[in-house]
């Protein structure tokens, strides 16, 4: 997926679990443009993960084996925590 195709990435952020939508969509909407191209590539790669894996990682019930994905999960958690609750 092209890191500059924001419409497609936005669609990929929409998941089958509300808990994931609450974590991923605000991060995309508020933070994606400020990421480096490399971070954008990693974020897009993270979106290719299965919902149960994403849920477990974002809820701290495990972590990805891939160090880059683990770093992106931590970044999502940190930025969401700093920003606070966002209405969906």
From Swiss-Prot:
GO terms for biological process: succinate metabolic process. Monomer. Its main location: cytoplasm. InterPro entries: SDH, SDH_sf, SdhE_FAD_assembly_factor. The lineage of its organism: Bacteria, Pseudomonadati, Pseudomonadota, Gammaproteobacteria, Enterobacterales. Keywords: Chaperone, Cytoplasm. The keyword Chaperone applies. It comes from Salmonella typhimurium (strain LT2 / SGSC1412 / ATCC 700720). The keyword Cytoplasm applies. One of its GO terms (cellular component) is cytoplasm. This is FAD assembly factor SdhE. SUPFAM superfamilies: YgfY-like. Belongs to the SdhE FAD assembly factor family. An FAD assembly protein, which accelerates covalent attachment of the cofactor into other proteins. Plays an essential role in the assembly of succinate dehydrogenase (SDH, respiratory complex II), an enzyme complex that is a component of both the tricarboxylic acid cycle and the electron transport chain, and which couples the oxidation of succinate to fumarate with the reduction of ubiquinone (coenzyme Q) to ubiquinol. Required for flavinylation (covalent attachment of FAD) of the flavoprotein subunit SdhA of SDH and other flavinylated proteins as well. It is found in: Cytoplasm.
């Amino acid at each position: 997926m092209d890191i500059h195709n924001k419409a497609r990435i936005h669609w990929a952020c929409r998941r089958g679990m509300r808990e994931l939508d609450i974590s991923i969509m605000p991060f995309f909407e508020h933070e994606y443009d400020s990421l480096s191209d490399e971070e954008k590539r990693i974020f897009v790669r993270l979106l290719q993960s299965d919902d149960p894996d994403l849920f477990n990682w974002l809820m701290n019930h495990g972590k990805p084996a891939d160090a880059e994905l683990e770093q992106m999960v931590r970044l999502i958690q940190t930025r969401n925590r700093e920003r606070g609750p966002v209405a969906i």
